[in-house]
Amino acid sequence: MNSEILKIAIPSIVSNITVPLLGLIDVVIVGHMGNAAYIGAIAIGSMIFNVICWVFGFLRMGTSGMASQAYGKGDDKGVANILVRALLIGLGIGMLFVVMQPIVRWAAMAAMAPQADVLPYACTYFDICIWGVPAMLGLYGLNGFFIGVQNTKVPMMVSIFQNVVNIVCSLSFVYLLGMKVEGVALGTLVAQYSGFALSLWLLKRQYGEYVKKCSLEAVKAKDEMKRFFVVNGDIFVRTLFLVAVNFMFTATGAKQGAVVLAVNTLMYQFFTFFSYVMDGFAYAGEAVGGKYYGAGKEAMFRSKVRHLFGWGLLLCLLYTMFYIVCGGGIMQLLSDDAIVIAASATYMSWVWLIPFAGMAAFIWDGLYIGITASRGMLISSLVAAVVFFLVYLCLFPSWGNHALWLALLLFLFVRGTVQTLMWRKIIRSRGIA
């Protein structure tokens, strides 16, 4: 039973680790161009597209939940229809971004407010990379399908392939053709479409029979379209709450000065390290939870829930011990600024609480997606966001940055707690005792 979970989780963890490398590679290349404005342009551009990735992540999550249920039922035609529907909607939204490029660019630059010397380079990077949004969102639909049919190896291979293509193309455009920011952007663009093309090829090679069973009439069916948009709409709004909390966390850190901002940015990496692994088990919850829920195998479904939380508790213990013992050393690896390192010691105890505060939210998110209980995810995120802002508003004047970290950890903890309290009612309403 654990092997089934690990078979999904481990490739997903590898994929999660490779995703940030696309932006990191760009930063490393421009970091050797001798102009700080190039670095700023890439940082701003990467942040814009990371937000797009995050906000439209519902295309992957909603697809994986519905596909895993259809897969568990043995409904190959249903799986095919879900895939094509997600793919068409993802490509459609992506093309809308391309068509609305001037408006999106204006809004993004107004929000980010880059300095005058950075602005033209940031616009150049944006104007090239925006053409990759259709491939990026189309790939979300494909990845949701692959997770739904219990195959996370394909997304892993595609992620690794994308990074290799990005490195080769960006280096070639910059050092062989003499390009600057535009070369780095083109490398990213080529990598995105290369990954999308590889994913389509692997889809045809391994799951061609699924695609042949697709019915365009069923894809456009009103009831199924409504279900798709209801589920994904809930996840979309839920994601906006997450974005709002993270934006507030970063913005409040910035208001406290450069040192506190640096401390919060570096300490947040501990949460990121934890999330890479926990997201892998969340994906396993989506895949195996949805499969056994769709198949109506209640005993297996409950068993998978227990095993997932067993892995979650084990990882909490390991991460907590690792952070307590090695947290200071990790901070010194992340920065050599003595002032930042000294300031971080005051807040390091909050890092130790990250695993136990956040574990349940990750596991429940995967399971809720698997059974398409998206409204529960939305409600838990709403309640948690309210708690975050209340704690921040009430305690920040007296507690300062400690209040900000308390609010963030409570946001994670409350999400998991609310989902725990709602779970029994939800599964009973779905016919699972």
Regions found by a protein language model. Give the residues of each.
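N-terminal transmembrane alpha-helices
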Residues: 1-33, 47-62, 66, 91-98, ...
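Alpha-helical transmembrane segments of multipass membrane proteins
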Residues: 24-28, 107, 141-145, 167-172, ...
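Short alpha-helical transmembrane segments in multi-pass integral membrane proteins
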Residues: 1-9, 67-134, 176-236, 289-354, ...
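Small-residue-rich hydrophobic transmembrane alpha-helices
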Residues: 39-99, 136-155, 250, 261-327, ...
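Helix-terminus/linker motif at the lipid-water interface of multi-pass membrane proteins
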Residues: 21-40, 109-116, 172-179, 240-273, ...
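Short runs within selected transmembrane alpha-helices of multi-pass transporters and secretion channels
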Residues: 128-148, 155-166, 184-199, 279-282, ...
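Transmembrane helical elements of multi-pass membrane transporters/channels
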Residues: 7-26, 128, 139, 161-162, ...
